[in-house]
Amino acid sequence: MTENGPAPQRSGSAQNMLTIGTAPDSWGVWFADDPAQTPWQRFLDEVAESGYTWIELGPYGYLPTDPAHLADELKARGLRVSAGTVFTAFHRGGEQGETAWEPARKVAELTAAMGGEHIVVIPAMWRDDVTGEAVESGTLDEGQWSDLFAGHNRLGAVLAADFGLKQQFHPHADSHVGAQPDIERLLAETDPDLLNLCLDTGHAEYCGASSLDLIRRYPERIGYLHLKQINPEILARVRAENMTWAAANLAGVMSEPPGGLPDLREVIEAVEGLNRPIFGIVEQDMYPVGFDVPMPIAQRTRNYLLSCGSRTTVR
């Protein structure tokens, strides 16, 4: 591993710049424990069988949390960890720093123990996924923005100092940071040494942001990628009916590549042009899903993405 991601490898005369991995999300996993989800052993088996090497931890508690146990399970399948995931609500101020830290510490400890170098940080959503009711305003006032920026700078500093991990902020549907102006404001008001983007191409498209524009205008702030696509016809329906993120997924808003938007060939070309190693983790949001559905999609997506770039690998 290097400071910014996977160690570059050589294929002929060119360095590999984008390393493709996958995540529990692509197997329909949103929660630590849910009988509707693929069992973790089957997930790991199918990831390896599908030809991937790198994975994310997914929701804390889905995979074994004992480092020795998890390390043995990964080694047996030739798998490695790129990142863990935490959730925050710093815009709410008050005790949110303390509230976020305990779960973040657990994820950071496990991620670092597995050799990962990144923590993907997802902001709280402003409406309930089940009922669709707003749990708070969908917009932030100036004080809330300030709390959000300060909280993430503090989190990034602790992750770096205590665990050697990099904070990759994940703009998210139904959160306060999803649209392009909000992403740009976040980048302007946070320390690039403490926070960069986990650019999720599907969430960006869903929220009306341009992945290509963000890569081209903020190349130094692209720290990590989630690769996915959106079905534009279903997205139009989602917007017309004001669906929640969960309802949109049930409606099929996520599209198996290459059938949706954005054009991942263009995204991968732009990312390879950054000329530094970076992870691109495949995410196919489809909770809940039958156990036999994810692996064929994961295999087809892997093969497609590897065809998109001249310096893209799974190793």
Residue ranges and their predicted role:
Residues 2-118, 142, 153, 196, ...:
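N-terminal pre-domain/capping segments
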Residues 3-10, 96-197:
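Active-site acidic/histidine proton-transfer and metal-coordination neighborhood
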Residues 22, 54-55, 150-257, 261, ...:
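Acidic/histidine-rich catalytic cores of soluble enzymes
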Residues 23-27, 58-60, 86-91, 124-126, ...:
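Active-site beta-loop-alpha junctions enriched in small/polar residues
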Residues 34-38, 125-134, 235-247:
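Short, flexible, mixed-charge acidic loops at enzyme active sites
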Residues 54, 118, 224, 278-279:
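Residues at the N-termini of beta-strands
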Residues 258-273:
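A short, acidic, amphipathic alpha-helical segment used as a generic capping/interface helix at domain edges
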Residues 281-296:
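A short, acidic, flexible beta-alpha connecting loop/helix-capping segment that sits on the rim
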